[in-house]
Amino acid sequence: MRAVVQRVISSKVEVDGRVIGSIGKGLNVLLGISKEDTEEDIKYLKEKIINLRIFEDENEKLNKSLLDIGGDIIIVSQFTLYGDCRKGRRPSFIEALGGEEAYILYNKFVESIKKEVNNVATGEFGADMKVYIENDGPVTILLDSKKTF
């Protein structure tokens, strides 16, 4: 399971011109699910994301987590995080989990976050989305539950 975690001032997702999810200060998470992912990957990434100390304290040090600041989170499914561009010019998405299986793991991930964070928004799984991200910093972290980064 892969995630691009961005510290944001605000973020929103639109589908067909209508806002389906929006947040204020917190994290925008683009989430990719692979064929090898299990509930253990969900647990690992959830704990890592909500406890990442990427928010500044009173001394401007990155010492606070999403939970510490009471921040929001928006989670957007993005299978293209498993695009393999090593051969040719067209990405291969063979490692990405598709369809119903990915939808189930995505929802389990979202539900696990909702147990820890008050304001959780999402995109629409499988939809063509417009994602608006107002970065803060910017601070962007790449995470992989298989630790390949």
From Swiss-Prot:
One of its GO terms (cellular component) is cytoplasm. Its EC number is 3.1.1.96. Keywords: Cytoplasm, Hydrolase, RNA-binding, tRNA-binding. The keyword Hydrolase applies. GO terms for biological process: D-amino acid catabolic process; tRNA metabolic process. It catalyses: glycyl-tRNA(Ala) + H2O = tRNA(Ala) + glycine + H(+); a D-aminoacyl-tRNA + H2O = a tRNA + a D-alpha-amino acid + H(+). It is found in: Cytoplasm. Its main location: cytoplasm. GO terms for molecular function: D-tyrosyl-tRNA(Tyr) deacylase activity; Gly-tRNA(Ala) deacylase activity; Ser(Gly)-tRNA(Ala) hydrolase activity; tRNA binding. A motif (Gly-cisPro motif, important for rejection of L-amino acids) lies at residues 137-138. It comes from the Bacteria. Homodimer. A Gly-cisPro motif from one monomer fits into the active site of the other monomer to allow specific chiral rejection of L-amino acids. Belongs to the DTD family. An aminoacyl-tRNA editing enzyme that deacylates mischarged D-aminoacyl-tRNAs. Also deacylates mischarged glycyl-tRNA(Ala), protecting cells against glycine mischarging by AlaRS. Acts via tRNA-based rather than protein-based catalysis; rejects L-amino acids rather than detecting D-amino acids in the active site. By recycling D-aminoacyl-tRNA to D-amino acids and free tRNA molecules, this enzyme counteracts the toxicity associated with the formation of D-aminoacyl-tRNA entities in vivo and helps enforce protein L-homochirality. This is D-aminoacyl-tRNA deacylase. It comes from Clostridium botulinum (strain Hall / ATCC 3502 / NCTC 13319 / Type A).
